[in-house]
């Protein structure tokens, strides 16, 4: 197994030389982003997953590369059904013929981690995700290789490559969960429970008794994959090919709004959300309902963080930089190197570019603002907590995704509108919370007892003119 790591490194070098050197000297097509995507696809395995993770980090990766990596596909040949059946029997104790009414031997989809087969249980169509027999070995080798790359970057002080250290570290941590399908099942169940009350999203139900570390069985969601729709739009400017994929009742703007609504409700009301909104993980269902699959990357937000993020979004739209700065500061991780004064000055400079000097309206899109803000926070060593960065990156990814199929949809304005709704709903919930109700009942009881006497004293003071004196003693209202 250890001999495989050097072989993987040699493969990496070979692909880089064969594809990269001719491009470097000739400067011909494919472009840099296309070449990078092609390199990762040729390397396959965990490098495809790494590329997909990089596509979700536009504050670190240039926009053209993010767009190219969004369509990154795991081009891996299927492994024989006999191997899949053997693994199912090892994991579940019985062969597929005894677990399912029928199972398609030809996989519906293949990837470096697993492949998916369609099956039926009591007439119910399900998706059976079976881990590739060599996945743990292959990913283990790549993880060791990534660790050596990080060591070299630090050892040789390759400062231009320091930006890679964070996503590579996240990738290593994420891979351990990706290889244990029980983690994905747990996240899918949590998000599925939350989706029960929302008609605009669907999460497949997990079949727990048929789920193990290397096998995952969920209900089958029958819909068009958003990635296929995006490719059809880009390949045929007339839109005929894309319209052929649209389900009944599909409207691009409504679908975009539903993606944003689901993201905000999950993040701000429940504190857990799908953080890997790659177009291959989104399905277009009837009536613009959004279907979600692949829950390997999930974001979590505490209640205080949710409140600050909502307030920060509203402050951004209204141009209140003081409030924006206070909210952002409350979300940052303690760091002795932090220079908050540098961040504040930089924020004021950016605001002059973000807002129209006459009308005060925003004149740049949401993605530009978020990328600027994260870049500034890095320069000032004033970084938000990791969960906050993940949320911001997810919102940026949504903006970049939506513009590809609903270019007229203003994600920033809609985010602000929905945040305002959520803030009002949060205030109503707080008002009706048990401690507030108890406080209200107690104060109401005191008012019933003391009210008549207080009103009598108020009338006497008013007749005596003492209320005007009290008003004069108050400080003037601030302008």
What label would you give each PLM region?
Residues 1-115, 119-122, 126, 137-172:
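N-terminal accessory/targeting segments that precede structured cores
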Residues 277-284:
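Hydrophobic residue at the +6 position relative to the catalytic HRD Asp in the kinase catalytic loop
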Residues 129-131:
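Conserved beta3-strand ATP-binding lysine motif
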């Amino acid at each position: 197994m250890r001999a495989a790591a050097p072989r993987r490194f040699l493969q990496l070098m070979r692909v880089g030389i064969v594809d990269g050197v001719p491009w470097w000297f000739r400067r011909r097509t494919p472009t840099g982003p296309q070449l990078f995507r092609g390199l990762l696809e040729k390397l396959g395995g965990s490098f495809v997953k790494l590329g997909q993770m990089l596509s979700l980090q536009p504050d670190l990766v240039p926009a053209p590369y993010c767009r190219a990596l969004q369509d990154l596909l795991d081009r891996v040949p299927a492994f024989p059904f006999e191997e899949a059946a053997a693994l199912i029997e090892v994991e579940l104790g019985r062969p597929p013929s005894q677990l399912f009414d029928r199972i398609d031997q030809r996989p519906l989809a293949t990837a470096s981690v697993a492949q998916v087969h369609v099956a039926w249980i009591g007439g119910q169509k399900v998706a059976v995700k079976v881990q590739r027999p060599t996945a743990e070995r292959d990913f283990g080798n790549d993880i060791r290789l990534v660790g050596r790359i990080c060591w070299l970057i630090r050892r040789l002080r390759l400062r231009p490559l320091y930006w890679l250290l964070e996503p590579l570290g996240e990738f290593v941590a994420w891979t351990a969960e990706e290889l244990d399908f029980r983690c994905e099942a747990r996240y899918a169940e949590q998000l599925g429970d939350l989706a029960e009350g929302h008609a605009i999203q669907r999460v497949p139900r997990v079949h727990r008794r048929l789920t193990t570390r290397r096998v995952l069985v969920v209900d089958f969601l029958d819909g068009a994959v958003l990635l296929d729709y995006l490719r059809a739009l880009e390949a045929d400017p007339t839109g005929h090919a894309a319209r052929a994929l649209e389900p009944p009742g599909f409207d691009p703007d409504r679908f975009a709004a539903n993606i944003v609504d689901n993201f905000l409700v999950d993040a701000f009301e429940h504190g857990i959300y799908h953080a890997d909104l790659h177009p291959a993980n989104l399905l277009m269902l009837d009536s613009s309902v959004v279907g979600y699959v692949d829950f390997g990357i999930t974001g979590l937000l505490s209640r205080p963080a949710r409140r600050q993020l909502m307030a920060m979004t509203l402050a951004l739209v209204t141009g209140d930089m003081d409030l924006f700065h206070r909210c952002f500061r409350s979300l940052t991780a303690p760091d002795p190197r932090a220079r908050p004064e540098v961040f504040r000055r930089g924020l004021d400079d950016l605001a002059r570019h973000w807002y129209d000097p006459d009308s005060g309206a925003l004149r740049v899109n949401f993605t530009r603002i978020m990328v600027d803000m994260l870049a500034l926070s890095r320069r000032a060593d004033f970084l938000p907590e990791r969960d906050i960065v993940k949320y911001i990156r997810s919102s940026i990814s949504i903006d970049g995704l939506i513009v590809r199929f609903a270019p007229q949809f203003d994600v920033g304005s809609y985010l602000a509108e929905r945040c305002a709704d959520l803030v009002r709903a949060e205030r109503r919930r707080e008002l009706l919370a048990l401690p507030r109700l108890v406080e209200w009942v107690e104060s109401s009881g005191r008012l019933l007892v003391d009210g008549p006497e207080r009103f009598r004293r108020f009338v006497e003071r008013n007749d005596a003119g003492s209320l005007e004196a009290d008003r004069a003693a108050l400080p003037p209202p601030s302008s």
